[in-house]
Structures are given as structure tokens and as C-alpha cells.
């Protein structure tokens, strides 16, 4: 019967240790990366992190489409 009690205590200790480790780890990389993608291409709906990348994408992928007004003053 003693082993059953030890097992329960060990599981609780391990769960506490795992929770502390997860808390210490910080944030989710995937969520942070998704939050950084704030510019969306109006033609193909691709998301980009900054206006410079957005302008480069637009000029290379959609050369015949006129540049959106938010990209007019951005230097690539």
C-alpha cells in the first residue's frame, strides 16, 4: 500500500515541477509570430511583418497591380 501513496505523491510533485517549468518557459512562439504579421496583401492575402517586406512582396509578386496608398511612401 505504501507504493500507491508514494506514486500519488510523485505524480503531484512531477505535475508541480512541470507547471513551474512551463511558467518559466514564457510565451508561445507560434502566437508571437502570428501577432507580428500585421500587414496583409490585398491581392493574395499573404501576411507580412513590416511595410518594407510588404512593398518588396507587392513589387515582385504583383507588378501590374497599382501600389496601395499605404505603401506609396515606404522605401524598400
From Swiss-Prot:
Region ranges (Disordered): 1-32, 53-76
Keyword Acetylation listed: no
Pfam families in alphabetical order: SERF-like_N, zf-met
ZnF C2H2-type span: 39-62
Biased composition (Basic and acidic residues): 17-31, 53-62
Subcellular localization(s) per the UniProt record: Cytoplasm; Nucleus
One BP term from GO: regulation of translation
One Gene Ontology CC term in the entry: nucleus
PROSITE patterns hit by this protein: ZINC_FINGER_C2H2_1 (PS00028)
Entry-linked InterPro entries: MBS1/2-like, SERF-like_N, ZNF706/At2g23090_sf, Znf_C2H2_type
One GO molecular-function entry: zinc ion binding
Keywords: Cytoplasm, Metal-binding, Nucleus, Repressor, Translation regulation, Zinc, Zinc-finger
Ranges annotated as biased composition (Low complexity): 1-13
Function: Transcription repressor involved in the exit of embryonic stem cells (ESCs) from self-renewal.
Protein name: Zinc finger protein 706
Species in which this protein is naturally found: Gallus gallus (Chicken)
Encoding gene (name): ZNF706
